[in-house]
């Protein structure tokens, strides 16, 4: 009887959730929209249905999303990624081009169709093709929670981003060129606060606001602080945390914070809400770049707006490493499988600066990796079929996985893992650029926290390392990459193939997806080289440019030998002909001018003798 009642309750709860769940259907057509986000330079931004900024999408746990993305561009492919969403059982809906799907060509429509399962919180959506989200193809995605654990009166959404006056399609080629061998990232012209500058936020006294803060930029981390107000952090990347109050927040691109802000009871004045740029990420700071943005918390529209509220140091910014999950999830068991990756930036043989994981710069395969899994049969468990330049790792379902990331670069890097949240179990402090990088030592490391911080995007500090831990319980293909868009373009990415046999069992390519692949000219079967006859034959795959040779090459030796021979011949010619011709030249000049050289020489000798006698006489006349 008890078993029957338990089953009945479970069934009733399940049916109730189905009844409560909604299906959200959106039709969005991409296109260029006239805009002037920073109020300085009009340009076109990527909008949906002739509108920009893009709309905020709101759903609840259990709801279904049916988003039809119509490519309205004339000559650009596109895709859409739902950042932070697990999209369980629907990996084709994750979005990264040539990882989980074929790109959508102009004029075609792709249906993103998935159910929002076991997630709540603050997320976003953006193009995962080229630098399109830096051109404006980005928006907020919120999964509302009827059981939100903290009290608040009103919700507010706040986005941060960097802004360029030029299009990403123009900036990218100038960045990835031999004329930029150091890999200096393009510097934004401005930084936006809710897709504008000098924004105002109208508030009421004595209220608690839940503010969802998202950095939807493509490059620079930012700081946030307020005049005479505090942030109480309660959520990070969709994960609830124990309350933590701070005056200063540091937020990298792709990260999200949910904070409570309680307003004052008085309305006699207004206050400043500042955003500041992490200038350590810039190779140089132009004199005209405004690194601090001044925005306003407005209590009284009749009162004057205050001046900027600058601070002397960013040293007191909250370190998210110490945030504890509200769920009290303990440190997972020891890892079953460890992936160690070394981050480096270097120049290849074409003179261009690339980014590397373990000396491999990611190059997209000729068949999306997910479609290789679905078509490979038993070969899907062999990492080789996914290409030598995709940095692919095959994971066993249910394994605890550690990613050890050693950063040999002198800059910070925010890394995002698709399809999962992870525990950050260690992050070493930054090491100076003139010192050697510190790498993780499994036998000598800091004590790991009992309740590690959990999120989906986290940054590694310069010349140091971090260790991430997660459970491989979402069997699909996942991208792990630096979310500085320039670094992704340079190749800083890894592909995780999680339980390929389960993927084959649970996922089938949709007819819509097949059509998209056919229209864009991308095979939907085969290995990384698009070979569907022999999955171990990678001839013709996309590979990185060759490395610069070390030491002398054959061509270099030959060039050096010929250069030396030419130099010796030149010296010999100069010496032989120069010295040999002196006498002949003198004879020729004497004949031309009818000069008697012997008589001239006798006169010169007599003059020398007279000069010597004169000098001796002068010397004797000087006082001693």
UniProtKB/Swiss-Prot annotation:
Residues 46-144, 190-292, 382-499 form the Plastocyanin-like domain. Residues 577-624 are cytoplasmic. One of its GO terms (molecular function) is copper ion binding. Residues 1-20 form the signal peptide. Residues 608-624 have a biased composition (Low complexity). Residues 21-555 are extracellular. It is a single-pass type I membrane protein. InterPro entries: Cu-oxidase-like_N (IPR011707), Cu-oxidase_2nd (IPR001117), Cu-oxidase_C (IPR011706), Cu-oxidase_fam (IPR045087), Cu_oxidase_CS (IPR033138), Cu_oxidase_Cu_BS (IPR002355), Cupredoxin (IPR008972), CuRO_2_Fet3-like (IPR044130). Cu cation 4 binds at residues 413, 482, 487. Cu cation 2 binds at residues 83, 126, 483. The chain crosses the membrane at residues 556-576. Coiled coil: none annotated. Glycans are attached at residues 49, 77, 113, 194, 198, 244, 265, 292, 300, 359, 441. Binds 4 Cu cations per monomer. It is an enzyme of class 1 (oxidoreductase). One of its GO terms (biological process) is reductive iron assimilation. Its cofactor is Cu cation. Cu cation 1 binds at residues 81, 416. It comes from the Eukaryota. Cu cation 3 binds at residues 128, 418, 481. Belongs to the multicopper oxidase family. PANTHER family: IRON TRANSPORT MULTICOPPER OXIDASE FET3, MULTI-COPPER OXIDASE. Iron transport multicopper ferroxidase required for Fe(2+) high affinity uptake. Required to oxidize Fe(2+) and release it from the transporter. Essential component of copper-dependent iron transport. This is Iron transport multicopper oxidase FET3. It comes from Candida albicans. The gene is FET3.
């Amino acid at each position: 009887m008890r078993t029957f009642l338990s089953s009945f309750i479970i069934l009733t709860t399940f049916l109730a959730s189905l009844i409560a769940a909604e299906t959200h259907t959106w039709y969005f057509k991409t296109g260029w929209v006239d805009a002037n986000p920073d109020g300085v330079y009009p340009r076109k931004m990527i909008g949906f249905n002739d509108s920009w900024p893009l709309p905020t999408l709101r759903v609840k746990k259990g709801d279904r999303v049916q988003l039809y993305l119509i490519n309205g561009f004339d000559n650009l492919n596109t895709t859409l990624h739902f950042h932070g969403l697990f999209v369980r059982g629907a990996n084709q809906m994750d979005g990264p081009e040539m990882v989980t799907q074929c790109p959508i060509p102009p004029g075609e429509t792709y249906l993103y169709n998935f159910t929002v399962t076991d997630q709540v919180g603050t997320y976003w959506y953006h193009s995962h093709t080229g630098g399109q989200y830096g051109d404006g193809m980005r928006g907020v995605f919120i999964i509302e929670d009827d059981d939100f654990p903290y009290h608040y009166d009103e919700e507010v959404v706040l986005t941060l981003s960097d802004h360029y006056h030029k299009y990403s399609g123009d900036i990218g080629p100038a960045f990835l060129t031999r004329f930029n061998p150091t890999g200096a990232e393009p510097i934004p012209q401005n930084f936006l606060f809710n897709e504008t500058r000098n924004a105002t936020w109208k508030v009421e006294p004595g209220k608690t606001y839940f503010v969802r803060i998202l950095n939807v930029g493509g490059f620079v981390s930012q700081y946030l602080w307020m005049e005479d107000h505090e942030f109480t952090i309660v959520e990070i990347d969709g994960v609830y945390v124990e309350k933590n109050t701070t005056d200063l927040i540091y937020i990298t691109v792709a990260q999200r914070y949910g904070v409570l802000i309680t307003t004052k009871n008085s309305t006699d004045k207004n206050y400043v809400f500042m955003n500041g740029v992490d200038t350590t990420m810039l190779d140089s700071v132009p004199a005209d770049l405004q690194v601090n943005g001044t925005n306003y918390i407005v209590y009284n529209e009749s009162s004057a707006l205050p001046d900027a509220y600058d601070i002397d140091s960013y040293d007191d910014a909250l370190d998210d490493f110490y945030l504890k999950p509200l769920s009290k999830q303990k440190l997972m068991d020891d890892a079953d499988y460890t992936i160690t990756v070394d981050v480096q930036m270097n120049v290849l043989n074409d003179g261009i600066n690339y980014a590397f994981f373990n000396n491999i710069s990611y190059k997209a395969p000729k068949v999306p990796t997910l479609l290789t899994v679905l078509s490979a049969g038993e070969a899907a468990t062999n990492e080789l079929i996914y290409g030598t330049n995709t940095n692919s790792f095959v994971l066993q379902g249910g394994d605890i996985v550690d990613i050890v990331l050693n950063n040999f670069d002198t800059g910070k890097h925010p890394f995002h893992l698709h399809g999962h949240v992870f525990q950050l179990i260690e992050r070493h402090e930054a090491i100076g650029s003139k010192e050697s990088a510190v790498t993780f030592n499994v036998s000598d490391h800091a004590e790991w926290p009992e309740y590690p911080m959990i999120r989906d995007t986290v940054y590694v500090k310069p010349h140091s390392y971090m260790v991430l831990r997660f459970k491989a319980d979402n069997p699909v293909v996942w991208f792990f990459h630096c979310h500085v868009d320039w670094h992704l373009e340079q190749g800083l990415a890894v592909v995780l193939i999680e339980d390929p046999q389960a993927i084959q069992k649970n996922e089938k390519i949709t007819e819509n997806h097949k059509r998209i692949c056919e229209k864009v000219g991308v095979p939907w079967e085969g290995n990384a080289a698009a070979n569907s006859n022999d999955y171990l034959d990678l001839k013709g795959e996309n590979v990185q440019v060759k490395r610069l040779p070390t030491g002398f090459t054959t061509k270099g030796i030959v060039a050096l030998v010929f250069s030396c021979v030419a130099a010796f011949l030149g010296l010999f010619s100069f010496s032989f002909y120069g010295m040999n011709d002196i006498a002949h030249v003198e004879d020729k000049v004497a004949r031309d001018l009818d000069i008697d050289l012997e008589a001239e020489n006798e006169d010169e000798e007599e003059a020398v003798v007279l000069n010597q006698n004169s000098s001796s006489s002068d010397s004797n006349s000087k006082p001693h």
